[in-house]
Each structure stands twice: as structure tokens, then as C-alpha cells.
Amino acid sequence: MKLVIKVTGKFFDDQGDKTPLSSAIRSLVQEGHRVALVTGGGTTARKYISLGRSLNLNEASLDLLGIWVARLNAFLMALSMPDLAYSRIPESLEQFLEYWGHGKVVVVGGFQPGQSTAAVSALVAEAISADYLVMVTTVEGVFDSDPKKNPNAKFLPRVTTTELKSILENTQSVKAGTYELLDPMAMKIVERSRIKVIVTSVDKIGKLTRIIKGEETASIVEPV
């Protein structure tokens, strides 16, 4: 299968061991999958965006700051897999497709201002006709409300994009560093190309192969 793995930037926020991610990618490749990895910017990106705001930078410039941090995280992961990953980080979809043609794992940060890394991951999934877009987040899947605010939030093993849009309504923002699980642009891409999305937690990175096989709990978002 062709897989796009989007990992929240919060995975890179602490100094903890990052080998579970590279090990999971390695396992997927060994099982015969083609893999693209997309990394977010996390707290470091938001820190630079905040510094940029203090200097009165515009939203496009703030986006660029976040993109460069996401690319740094991508470069870190590419360096950690020298035998598997293409050594350069693409800065556009055209570059991504060029690197993808070499047959290796391609690791991506951001492309251009106005796009979240969620949108980038959806674009990449669309461009390679991915079987799944796997969103690795800070929660174990999709809930009917924010589980961090509502302890009684209900876990949803299957949800449509229409239902997910309703859940996320009024929580989206287009400002740099404030994107949600799937922002409007990412949602449109998922719907127009009917990309199946799996949502899981960073705590389960080591179980990605089982998640892909449906042997581990995760949420599946069906495009409609």
C-alpha cells in the first residue's frame, strides 16, 4: 500500500526518544509499503510565530516561520533513516513527486504559506493516490467533543467527513500555528479524492503496522 503518515509537531516538543517513529516507518517499508512522512512544527513553531507576531510580521511571514520549523523536524527524521529516506526535504509538491520517484521514503515539512501540514499531507496523499492518510495526533482518535475538555467525550471508531466537519465546526482557525486535525483545505482534498483517513495517537506510533491492518484501535474517517 501507499501510505502518508502525518505526525503532530508535538511529538518533537520534548527530548524523549524518537526512535519509535523511525522504527515504525522501517517496519512499514519492510512489509512492502511505500511511505511518505509529514511532520508538523509543534511548540517550537508556535514559539517562533509568537516572536514574529511581536515583530508585527504578517500572516504569510508567520506561516513561513512555522514551515521552516516543520522542515527542520522533517530533516531530523530523514537523517535518522539514511538508508530508507531521501536525503532532501521537498519544498513543493513538484519536488516531492520528483523525490518520490526515487523509490525511497520522502519526509516533508511544509510547502507554502496558507497551508497547514494537515493540508500538505492531504495533498501528498492525493498526488500519490495513497491508500491511507494516517494522522498521528495527541489523542487516540476522533471523539464527539474535545476529550481534553470533556472527560465524557465519546470515542468514534468510524466517522464521515461530514460528521467530522460538524464536530470541528467553530474550532478552526486560519492563523499560523492554530490549525486543527483537518482544516478546511485538508478536508476538501480528502473529500474530492476520497482519501481514507486513520486517526491515532502518538502513544501508538510503535503500533502503526497493527493499526494499518485494523488490529489496533483507531478512528477511520470515511470521505463522503
Curated annotation (Swiss-Prot):
Stated regulation of activity: Inhibited by UTP.
This enzyme's EC code(s): 2.7.4.22
Keywords attached to this entry: ATP-binding, Cytoplasm, Kinase, Nucleotide-binding, Pyrimidine biosynthesis, Transferase
Pathway stated in the Swiss-Prot or TrEMBL entry: Pyrimidine metabolism; CTP biosynthesis via de novo pathway; UDP from UMP (UMPK route): step 1/1
Chain positions recorded as UMP binding sites: 41, 63, 111-117
GO CC terms: cytoplasm
SUPFAM superfamilies on file: Carbamate kinase-like
GO biological process: 'de novo' CTP biosynthetic process; UDP biosynthetic process
Residues annotated for ATP binding in this entry: 6-10, 42, 46, 137, 143, 146
Pfam families (alphabetical): AA_kinase
Main location per the UniProt record: cytoplasm
Places the protein is found: Cytoplasm
Taxonomy, superkingdom: Archaea
Family statement: Belongs to the UMP kinase family.
NCBIfam families associated with the record: pyrH_arch
Complexes and interactors: Homohexamer.
Protein name: Uridylate kinase
Taxonomic lineage: Archaea, Thermoproteota, Thermoprotei, Sulfolobales, Sulfolobaceae
